[in-house]
Each structure stands twice: as structure tokens, then as C-alpha cells.
Amino acid sequence: MDFTLDQKHEMARDLFKQFAETEVKPLAQETDETEVFPAETVAKMGKYGFMGIPVPKEYGGQGCDPLTYVMCVEELSKVCGTTGVIVSAHTSLCIDPIMTFGTEEQKKKYVPDLASGKKIGAFGLTEPGAGTDAQGCQTKAVLDGDEWVLNGSKCFITNGKVADVYIIIAITSITEDKRGRKKKNFSAFIVDKGTPGFSFGTKEKKMGIRGSSTYELIFEDARIPKDALLGKEGRGFPIAMHTLDGGRIGIAAQALGIAEGALERTIEYTKERKQFGRSIAQQQNTQFKLADMATRIDAAKYLVYAAAMKKAEFAKNPKVSYSVDAAKAKLFAAETAMAVTTECVQLRSEEHTSELQSPVPIS
């Protein structure tokens, strides 16, 4: 696989990096401390086209490949984890399933406003009793005439309260096989904010990424049109799994950016920090640690970029699967982010106790 970036990719990265440094980084600390969604920054990203990078131009997007999108999330996350995950959840978990499974009418209705950033997207699968066990979901949708009636709740939803468009997975029927074993049949729906019966519950208090709006979604006899069904009835689980494949690449890019940002800040610090008459960057023990972190980050980057390129192949040939590539990328990039940020805190010694000196882009 060729990892050489062409001129367009390099130019895109420069744009993302410049925006991150000038528009995102100065507000990152405040975003984390106040736990307020960075609405102005998101609006600016919409104007720059960051909210619809992989969306075809005919639907208002930039028409770029998955790798360009990954680089955007990566560069944003170097300075602010919050901003990176906002773009990731919006694009991978809301726009992508509409583009992949939606009707032409649904695409025209929702995608242009999502791609421009005029509207924000979210995805609701996780429930209090259904995390890794996605089939444990209890939220139900019952067809009543020309409307679906939703009842249930979702939790830990990124972009929760600020979103305008939600992809919701719910049970639409339960069937039995010849042995009497029951099977839940799920379907996917597009739900608009403001739908009667749709409200918000608990706002999650988090240790990091605190500017991201993470909320509980509550559905109490929420009625949505019959044509809000995304894809075919009973195909909600495959739709959710496909969506999560793309989501894993986005989160992998976020983790990669966080690790890179932490290492960059720590390298600067080690050059300034003096011990025993010289900077700690000149001490071999420090150099070993920095080298190990840089190596892990490069390995993670190759996995993340490879997954993005595999997703691009899928767009041309649906028989190509990128599920394993996405899972590997998320696993290794997330573990790398944890390992690198932990080591960076150790190198910063007592300095890490000051929020203003944090080496980790936790916002």
C-alpha cells in the first residue's frame, strides 16, 4: 500500500493545521474548563468545508477521500480532542449512513445542511444496558398508520443536545425461529430535533473532551414520519455495524492526533527544562522515551491511514471490507494515545499538575 501523500493531501493538511493552530488551539483550554460546546468554532469549520469533507460535491460537500477526512480529524485533535470528536461523530456516524443507505429524497433533505455545518449530526445506539452488546438495545419503534412511534432511551451520545439530526437504532419486531428462540429485528431511523416526545436527559460529566455535548436521549411516544426509516425495515443492525466501522476510523484519527499533540508539546518542554546543568532532552533516558513514543505514533499512523485508504477502495468496490482494518486502527491508536499521554505526564513531572501546563489535549 502506497502511503505517499500527493500535493492535494499536503495542501489539505496545511489548511487543517493552520486552522487548528489559529482558531482551535487558543480556545481549547477554555472549552475544556467551561464544558461549553464550541459553537463559533464549529460554525467556522462549516464555512471552511470541514463538516462535509468526504461528502460528494453534488450534496454540498468537498468530495474528498477518507484520508483527507482522517487528516482533518487528526490535526484538530492535536490541539483539541473535543473539536476532533465533534467532526468525527457528525461525519462518520450521521452523514455516512445517510449517504450509504438513504433514499435520494433523504440525501437531498439532510446532507447539504449537514455538510455545510448549518446542522449538526449525531448517532444513537448505546443504551444503559447495551454498550458492547449492541443487540441488547431496548428502544422500540412501532408503526402506527403513517408514523413510527419511538419509546426508549440512548446514552453517552456525542453531539447529543447540540445536534439537529439523529440516526437512531430501534427494535421494530421480534420473531421466533423453529426452536422458539426470539430474535430482535432492528431498524434505523432519521429523527429531527424538536420531534414531539423527543427530549434530553442527563448531561454526562467527563474527565476529558468536556466541550463535547454528551447527553442521554429520551423517546416517549415520539412520532416520526413513516419515511424517516433509513434503509430497509429490519436492516438496522447491519446499518449500525457499517456505521461503526467508519466511526472507528474517525476515533482512531482522533486518538492519533491526541498522541501527536502530546508528544509535540512534551518535546518542546524537554528542550526548555534544565536539570543538572543541561536540558532533559539531552539526557539519554529522556531520548529513549521520546523515541519509543514517536515509533508507536508512526505505527499507529500507518494503521489509521491504511484503514482510510481501504475505505476509499470500498467506495469503488462494495465487496472490499475494511472492518478489520478499522478495528485494528482504533485499537492500536487508542492504546497509543493512552501510553503516550501517560509517558508525557511522567516527563513533565510536577508540571502536569497545573492545568495550564497540561501536555495532553484533553479538551
Mark where each language-model region is.
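Alpha-helical interface subdomain recognition
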Residues: 1-89, 101-106, 113-118, 131-137, ...
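Glycine-rich phosphate/pyrophosphate-binding beta-alpha loops
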Residues: 81, 155-160, 208-209, 245-250
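A short, Trp-centered hydrophobic/proline-enriched beta-strand micro-motif
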Residues: 117-125, 169
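Short Gly/Pro-enriched turn/cap motifs at secondary-structure boundaries
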Residues: 129-132, 156-159, 179-181, 206-213
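A short core secondary-structure module
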Residues: 146-147, 151-200
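Long, acidic (Asp/Glu-rich), low-complexity accessory segments flanking structured domains
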Residues: 220-239
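Single conserved hydrophobic/aromatic residue that forms the stacking wall/gate
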Residues: 352-363
